[in-house]
């Protein structure tokens, strides 16, 4: 896993966190 893959995973985690934050309110 390269660094690029880790960066993509990190961005995906941020996106999921933002979606969850909006749902929770």
Curated annotation (Swiss-Prot):
GO terms for biological process: D-alanine biosynthetic process. It catalyses: L-alanine = D-alanine. Pathway: Amino-acid biosynthesis; D-alanine biosynthesis; D-alanine from L-alanine: step 1/1. The keyword Isomerase applies. GO terms for molecular function: alanine racemase activity. Optimum temperature is 30 degrees Celsius. Thermolabile and psychrotrophic. Shows catalytic activity even at 0 degree Celsius. Its EC number is 5.1.1.1. Optimum pH is 8.3. Keywords: Isomerase, Pyridoxal phosphate. Its cofactor is pyridoxal 5'-phosphate. Homodimer. Catalyzes the interconversion of L-alanine and D-alanine. Belongs to the alanine racemase family. This is Alanine racemase. It comes from Pseudomonas fluorescens.
